[in-house]
């Protein structure tokens, strides 16, 4: 049930993910018209869910799919046949069921926070939405780490297509759903109907195509679906967690097709964009937080938008629960464990290893006294990344680089910032390395 999956994903940004995994993911959702039955294995879980989560579950299920009633029950979901696309008995797309293609209307271009790291991707998605099927951006491939806004832009483009032309048939699927639908069609001997469903839409949006790696039959079917849509000038928008040519297990001919249109990277947001995202998400929730709190979260959380949103949700939830004002002190206290975990994830040794591997060096090369250009530039870049991604002081960073003086670190940071304005290759290296830390 698609709306239940989206509900769980949203809840993981509002509550501790381990709590969602423990108490909510074991539930089995069964939709009956405008009602949903959530089956739990025992009374204890039902009582806990009812006390802690039921109100929010009702809100989200109503938002995602118009569900009016949510019921908790002990047992297991009955076996049912799930249709991914509304079809009639002839295999044509049903004209009696409003076609929304699993689009989440919450995501649009207005609530997407634009920054240097994503402005090209936003512009590309907007163009695809305005001129679907145009060969300059068909297919449109958005790639980058988790939680950087790829799916947001995909939904936003699909929603604009539907706004411009309400009869436009836009289908959004995660790659796992495409795979599951194909497996069901093989089992039911209904592959012809499966193919017609996808060939008769106006735009196809598929998330996380790296999931296709190693699945030969799935790639075969997607290859033919891609060709049919492309030849018919229907828009294709895809996302991937990395540049497709770097995905092992994707067939060369599929990689070639993906390169026909426009491929755009989304990088981790810089500090200013992170702060703007926190403030925008707070406004969406109707919460008011001081700028300095947004700056605190932006400075401490570097990896992706989901982490920023998770920190904000934790902060707002505790403020509402305790009735306390959101101050710097309150924020540091509330987010202490979360921020500590973030810092432990990205440490200077980790940065040194990733930079050394990226340039084909050894860590001892970065720490050596040699000043050849092939070593000096990666060393400076590693120092600048340590300044950007950790809370270590300049002297501490210098100590980690074989006892270098803090002025050396400061010079490296300034030099990298200056050179990135003119050297495209260095800027690309910086962006690629930042993406590695968001994975």
Swiss-Prot record:
GO biological process terms, alphabetically, are: DNA replication initiation; regulation of DNA replication
Residues annotated as region Domain II? 75-101
Q: Quick one: where's region Domain III, AAA+ region? A: 102-319
Residues reported to bind ATP? 147, 149-151
Q: SMART domains under this entry?
A: AAA, Bac_DnaA_C
One protein family per Pfam? DnaA_N
User: What's a single GO MF annotation on this record?
Assistant: lipid binding
Keywords carried by this UniProt record: ATP-binding, Cytoplasm, DNA replication, DNA-binding, Lipid-binding, Nucleotide-binding
Q: Name one GO cellular component term.
A: cytoplasm
Where does the protein end up?
A: Cytoplasm
Q: InterPro entries under this entry?
A: AAA+_ATPase, Chromosome_initiator_DnaA, Chromosome_initiator_DnaA-like, Chromosome_initiator_DnaA_CS, DnaA_C, DnaA_dom, DnaA_N_dom, DnaA_N_sf
The ranges of region (Domain IV, binds dsDNA) come to: 320-439
Give the span(s) annotated as Domain I, interacts with DnaA modulators: 1-75
Family assignment from sequence similarity: Belongs to the DnaA family.
Q: How does it assemble?
A: Oligomerizes as a right-handed, spiral filament on DNA at oriC.
Report the protein's function: Plays an essential role in the initiation and regulation of chromosomal replication. ATP-DnaA binds to the origin of replication (oriC) to initiate formation of the DNA replication initiation complex once per cell cycle. Binds the DnaA box (a 9 base pair repeat at the origin) and separates the double-stranded (ds)DNA. Forms a right-handed helical filament on oriC DNA; dsDNA binds to the exterior of the filament while single-stranded (ss)DNA is stabiized in the filament's interior.
What's the protein name? Chromosomal replication initiator protein DnaA
């Amino acid at each position: 049930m698609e709306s239940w999956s989206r509900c769980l994903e949203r809840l993981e940004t509002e509550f501790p993910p381990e709590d969602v995994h423990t108490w909510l993911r074991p539930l089995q959702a069964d939709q009956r018209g405008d009602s949903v039955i959530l089956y739990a294995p025992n009374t204890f879980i039902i009582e806990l869910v009812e006390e802690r989560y039921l109100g929010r579950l009702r809100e989200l299920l109503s938002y995602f799919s118009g569900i009016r009633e949510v019921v908790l029950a002990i047992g297991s979901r009955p076996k049912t046949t799930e249709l991914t696309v509304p079809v009639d008995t002839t295999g044509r797309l049903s004209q009696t069921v409003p076609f929304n293609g699993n689009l989440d209307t919450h995501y649009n271009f207005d609530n997407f926070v634009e920054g240097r790291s994503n402005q090209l991707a936003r512009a590309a998605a907007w163009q695809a939405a305005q001129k679907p099927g145009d060969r300059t951006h068909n297919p449109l491939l958005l790639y980058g780490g988790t939680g950087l806004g790829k799916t947001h832009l995909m939904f936003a483009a699909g929603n604009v297509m539907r706004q411009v032309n309400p009869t436009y048939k836009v289908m959004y699927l995660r790659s796992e759903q495409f795979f599951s639908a194909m497996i069901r069609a093989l089992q039911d001997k209904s592959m012809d109907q499966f193919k017609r469903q996808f060939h008769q839409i106006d735009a196809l949006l598929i998330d996380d195509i790296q999931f296709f790696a190693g699945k030969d039959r799935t790639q075969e079917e997607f290859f033919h679906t891609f060709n049919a849509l492309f030849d018919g000038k229907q828009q294709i928008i895809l996302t991937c967690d990395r540049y497709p040519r770097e995905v092992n297990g994707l067939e060369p001919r599929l990689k070639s097709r993906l390169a026909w249109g426009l491929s755009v990277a989304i990088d981790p947001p810089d500090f200013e964009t992170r702060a703007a995202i926190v403030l925008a998400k707070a406004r969406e929730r109707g919460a008011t937080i001081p700028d300095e709190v947004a700056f605190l979260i932006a400075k401490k959380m570097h990896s992706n938008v989901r982490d920023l949103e998770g920190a904000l949700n934790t902060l707002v939830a505790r403020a509402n629960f305790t009735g306390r004002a959101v101050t710097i002190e309150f924020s540091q206290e509330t987010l202490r464990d979360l921020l500590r975990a973030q810092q432990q994830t990205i440490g200077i040794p980790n940065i040194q290893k990733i930079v050394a591997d990226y340039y084909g060096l050894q860590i001892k090369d970065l720490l050596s006294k040699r000043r050849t250009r092939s070593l000096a530039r990666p060393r400076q870049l590693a120092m600048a990344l340590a300044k950007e991604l950790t809370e270590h002081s300049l002297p501490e960073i210098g100590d980690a680089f074989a006892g270098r003086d803090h002025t050396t670190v400061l010079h490296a940071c300034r030099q990298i910032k200056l050179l990135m304005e003119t050297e495209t290759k260095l800027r690309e290296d910086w962006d690629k390395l930042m993406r590695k830390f968001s994975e």
